[in-house]
Amino acid sequence: MLHISSMPSDYGVGVFDENVIHFIDKIADMGFTYWQVLPFNPIDRANSPYCSPSAFAGNYIFINPKGLYDMGLICEEDYKSNIYDGTPYTADYEFAGKKRLELLKKAFLNINDELARQIKEFEISNSWLTDYSVFMAVKEEENMKPWWEWSDEHAHYFECIKDIYSYEKSAAFWKFVQFVFYKQWNEIKAYANKKGVAVIGDMPIYVAMDSVDVWSNLPMFLIDEKTLKVEKVAGVPPDYFSKDGQLWGNPIYDWNAMEKDDFSWWISRIGHSLKLYDTVRIDHFRAFASYWAVPAESKTAKVGEWLDGPKMKLFNKVFEAYPNAPIIAEDLGVFGDDVVKLLEDTGFPGMKVVQFGFDPNSDSSHIPHNSVQNSINYVGTHDNNTILGWLWEASDEERKFALEYCGFTGDNWGEGGYYSPSCRKIIETVWKSSSNVAIIALQDMCGFGSDARMNIPGVPEKNWRFRTTKETIDNIDSSYFKHINSLFRRMYPAFDDKKN
């Protein structure tokens, strides 16, 4: 597991360039057949890919500047202006966002008739693009304010879209941006697939209030269409990650309204994700069974209520459109019988995280000996500490149990690095599980500590910043991972012969 933002690059964050190709080559040589990424959507001000202005658009900061040069749209001096001279170990979203936007606007001025034709074809096959491009064009005109603070003629979607031709030129730029994003990503994905590596993507369940999805589809959300008042917002109650719960603040879907048109927005969204990736992990899957609704004025997620989700009414429609859809259900956190039943009814694999299993006082479903075959087993997710960081921060009782369970008998459990003996024992324990798929973050392949953690749920600052270098990737003990992938029979192909 390694997100694009965390890849090595010369541009402040990872981009779709030769460094990603190199990473794919390395993991393929080690026998890995799955590569998991975080959501590709544009990010919010806290740099979170889970709170986006669009459920369909891609984040333009991942566009490779040199790729624009290779398309003949900019000169060498232009793309080199995007080169970053700061630390290679931290993603600089502010730098990348500013520089990439400037470069894309310059490139847009140089598109020719053939490229314009290709962009038009892209637009025709992506129905979401018109609303998104108008939304972004108007947002720029409104000085990037949230849409509910726009002037009346813009804030109301149906009034704004009547005058769509007045935004044609400025909207055309955003169509171009998405065309380039998907062109570059599709080339990367095709290469990964050719190397036998399938991409597991991530789809957030909720969208941001300040998003094209809410602006253009108000009746789909529990929002007063006249006052724009939101009574309840999304979150989760207190859990492993946070004693106050997590107050996400996203608007909540009006499932009854969505059912009336056979969940068409969700069918489109899931279909889009299935084209973007080979397999889709749906974040916070439990909300389809029941979801935590928090009063909009609340400062924490402690106070709320469980409300019914659409359950199989939605997924019956999904299966009608996409039989055998390759979906992973992120089923972590607090859940009850309704979530268990929904998992059984859909047949989707759930998730196991070994760190959650190291409770000496219970026989957790996350402990590897309780793993079921139809599951994905993680050393840790993007929301977890690194495994070395966890060992250092765990209670003495938890750490003793974890090390004993994994068969580690030495006294150097705190030793990190590429050959960390304690990390290897835990990795091997996950690899021995009966779960069909086992996944590890790059940080844990390297034996990094908690300073390399990707995200701390409930903490708004300094997340999503981890970056690696080419040297780090090259220093990973490839022979070790190739050995355990072979030893524990995890080198099976991600694609069958028919797909190849």
What are these regions (language model features)?
Residues M1-D29, V177:
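Asp/Glu-centered strand-loop micro-motifs enriched in Gly/Pro and often flanked by an aromatic residue
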Residues H3, S9-G12, A46-Y182, V207-I439, ...:
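Alpha-amylase-like alpha-glycosidases and glucanotransferases acting on alpha-linked glucans and related
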Residues E18-I43, K275-Y277:
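Catalytic domains of carbohydrate-active enzymes, especially glycoside hydrolases
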Residues A28, W185-N193, F319, L343-E344:
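Surface-exposed amphipathic alpha-helices with a cationic face
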Residues F32, V197, A325:
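Short glycine/serine/threonine/alanine-rich loop segments
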Residues L38, A198-I200, P204, T279, ...:
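Outer-envelope exported proteins of Gram-negative bacteria
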Residues W174-V207:
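Conserved, well-ordered alpha-helix/loop/beta-strand core segments that scaffold catalytic motifs
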Residues G447-K499:
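Structured C-terminal cap/extension of enzyme domains
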